[in-house]
Amino acid sequence: MIHTSLLPEITIPDTLLTPYVLQRAERLADTPALVDGATGRTLTYAEFAGAVKAMAGGLKARGFGKGDVLAIMAPNVPEYAVAFHGTAWAGATVTTINPTYTAHEVQHQLKDSGATLLVTVSMFLPIAKEAVEGTGVTEIFTIDPSDASPMTALMGEPLLEQVEVSPDDVVALPYSSGTTGLSKGVMLTHRNLVANLVQTTAVLAVDEGETMLSFLPFFHIYGMQVLMNNALAQGGKVVTMARFDLEQFLQLAQDHHVKRAFVAPPIVLALAKHPLVEKYDLSRLESVFSGAAPLGAELAEEAAARLGCEVVQGYGMTELSPVSHSTPKGMYKPGSIGILIPSTESRIVDPETGKDLGLGEDGEIWVRGPQVMPGYLNNDKATKDTIDDEGWLHTGDIGHVDADGH
């Protein structure tokens, strides 16, 4: 049985990622786009778009473009979005690296992705220098002052138009740990990421000027898409946190009148139980959205009761750009990951027999839609094991669908 979304079908625009993300930048020129939570340092939409185009111009002048890969290994800071979209505007591909990786793990990703430039911060420079040995990386740049080249050295004459590439070209290469061995490069195209941004507006619409408090790392697909790209495309204000600190999170949520918090289950636990929460005014909070790992119904209820707002879940994976299920406002159900987002299909399949299962029966979740990756980089076997000939992505996760489509 094929399950379809309860929400109306949508049309996916035939556009590239960064033009889509910058669609409101001109109109919102003087509005804050990115704010460093720790210092208050701000990039307006005009400054953000200008920096993206200057970086793309600098990359193009170096002969860096389609088919080339720039790696980013940095915490969440405003310049992360500049490096990401400057690379995309130049027609190239970004691979995002977990800064907590060992030098060996970083080296694997640099080699496997074919990265030739690396953007990092001074704190991670020693690991970066060790990791680039024996890879194709020719130069390291840092966002903050260090003994490496500054990221500003990548800036050049602004490139006013996006370099022409196909929406089916790969723009992002996050790495997914998968279940075995070293992580695998997940090829995500412009079309994949734009599709998921449009699909999720039905459930994650952002008001212009609304603050998105962003401590979920941008190297991870949840932070990259649901926070950074989603908020910027809709005219939101992305307030970055380099790492999670409960007190700073609560202070920023209070100061910036945060309406929706995007978190993972350990943060829900803190919001439900930590005494610090009582010291801050979180009365503007309308919902807490938890992803990245399963959230128990009891904990969600406890946090919701304390905060006086909905605590809901979504579901996705890197290979799905990332969202396939989410909970629209007013549709909360305890323990549910929500309903299918628009233009997405799913099946619940018996992993032993491959037969479709009925309502209420647990089986493997399969997903099909425009957000499904074309495959893993340099790994046809893993791709064939994950996506079948009919385009169904076999998630490896177990769940069931109830009578209400949850």
Language model region names:
Residues D30, E157-Y175, L182, A205-T211:
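Conserved pre-ATP/AMP-binding loop-to-beta segment of ANL
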Residues A33-V77, A81-H85, T102-Q107:
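Conserved AMP-binding/adenylate-forming core of the ANL superfamily
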Residues T42-A46, V171-V198, T327:
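Conserved AMP-binding A3 loop
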Residues R62, M73, K355-G360, E364-H406:
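Conserved ATP-binding/catalytic segment of the ANL
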Residues D68-V69, P75-T95, P99-A103, H108-L117, ...:
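A short helix-loop-beta submotif of the ANL/AMP-binding
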Residues M123-P167, H274:
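ANL superfamily adenylate-forming
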Residues V194-T211, F218-R260, K273-H274:
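Conserved AMP-binding/adenylation subdomain of ANL enzymes
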Residues D255-V263, A272-K333, E345:
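Gly/Ser/Thr-rich phosphate-binding loop
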